[in-house]
Amino acid sequence: MIDRDSKLLQIIDQNPGIQFREIMRSSGLKNGVLSHYLSKLEKHGIIKVIRGPRQTRFYPPQITEDESTVIKALRKQTPRDLLLALITEDELEFSQLVKEVKKSPSTVSLYLSQLVEDELVEIRLVDLKKRYHIKARDLIDKLIEDYRPSILEKPTSGFEDIINAF
């Protein structure tokens, strides 16, 4: 591997689920050059690329599909805040989650629905009230521990949160 390949691989290893623009900022490479090297790394199976609507995320090859789902959620501020609130205190009601993450009910609803759809959070009925519970607790705990500096302490702006909603 040449120096650029090593640099890109290091960036992706340290920041699983990173998007193209973030890699471009971190590496200092221009769009076309970066695209060429990432395509080459993907073709040789050195990195894993998951393409979704309006976004492409890059992962080390050992990351599983379940892990990539958790990492995708942890890389966005609001879903990360929701998961951390549920880790701190399990079985919260919707209104409690709204207070915890300090976002509007519609924003919390949007991201909570996505977390439920991704099977990271489940809804339980307790005393006829909906309560939210982390479904993949062990996996989330493991990934937070493994990638804490890069995923959890990396600031994301509200604007990026809106743009990268899904």
Region annotations inferred by a language model:
Residues 22-26, 96-101:
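A short acidic, leucine-rich amphipathic alpha-helix
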Residues 15-19, 77, 89-93:
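Short capping segments at the starts of secondary-structure elements
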Residues 29-40, 102-117:
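Short amphipathic alpha-helical interaction segments
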Residues 20-25, 29-68:
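Long, low-complexity, charged/polar intrinsically disordered regions in eukaryotic proteins
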Residues 1-7, 54-80:
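Short alpha-helical segments that sit at the start of domains
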Residues 1-2, 6-14, 80-88, 105, ...:
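Long, low-complexity, charge-rich intrinsically disordered regions
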